[in-house]
Amino acid sequence: RLAMKGYSITIFDSKKKLGGLNEYGIAAYKSLENFAERETKFVLSIGGIEHKLNSTLGKDITLEELQNDYDAVFLGLGLSGVNHLRLEGENSEAIDDAVNYIEDLRQSQNLADLPVGRKVVVIGGGMTAIDMAVQIKKLGSEEVTIVYRRGQKDMSASIEEQQNAQNNGVLIRHWSKPSKLLINEKTVNGVEFEYTENKNGKLVATGEKFSIKADMVFRAIGQTFESSIDNLPKLENGRILVDNNYKTTVSGIWAGGDCVKDGEDLTVSAVEAGKIAANSIHNELVS
């Protein structure tokens, strides 16, 4: 939008390709071939847009440098961190993040190079958990189980997506939380779970446990905003605070998408935030 108004734009991206979640985070079974690449090529064809890849904010370039070199800065940082289960052995090779596997799959030139477990457990209740489970089932896993600590209606994944997973052979178990990774010499053999229940609005463990055998375990319990970058604008609830025009508390800096307070995990919402911020930037620069 700003390029169409005649501004010279520079995009910095930490990855080797543009496209963000559309390129790296959407399961392959949901995406058309090279759709993200085609979309970015269309945007770049507008003209006046330079892009610099493998450029990580806070490592390869600082926020202060961007402020000095450009009239306005828009931060679309997404959520690069992941939540952890806080279980013993979690930092070993026995468990992986679903987002990492989906990224590897999307960028793989040969699917035969990807590990595919025979029995797979996915821990979580959102769209990433569903995508991970359906994707690896389609790749050939014999048994895939999603385990979520609350009930079906509490899952952030829609009922339709849950049903789609089940139609693809994925088992979904509710009211269970992981209590122990079953590991033998860095090799995962399964996960021990404890049944949960809702008591007076609080999730409590019942003390009764069970185990699911698995040779691959994936974590899909949400992502977090990595806020270790120097001189970031003010945060609230762990994300960047913005006004209705997506302007931050720091003059000359706007932000949008998942990295801002109340940001939604939706591409269309991030695009809308970018449009609103672009108009705000233009209005401020011409005033």
PLM features per residue range, with description:
Residues K17, G126-T128, V260-K261:
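Residue-level detector of alpha-helix initiation sites
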Residues K41-K59, V82-L139, E236-T249:
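Glycine-rich dinucleotide-binding loop and its adjacent helix/turn
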Residues M132, C259-S287:
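A conserved FAD-binding loop/helix module that cradles the flavin
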Residues I11, K15-S45, K52, A133-K180:
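Rossmann-like dinucleotide-binding cores of NAD(P)H-dependent redox enzymes
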Residues N91-G117, G201-D265:
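FAD-site-proximal beta/loop scaffold in flavoenzymes
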Residues R1-I11, T128-K137:
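N-terminal Rossmann-like FAD-binding beta1-loop-alpha1 element of flavoenzymes
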Residues E37-E88, K180-E192, M216-F218, T224-E226:
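Feature captures the FAD/FMN-dependent oxidoreductase FAD-binding
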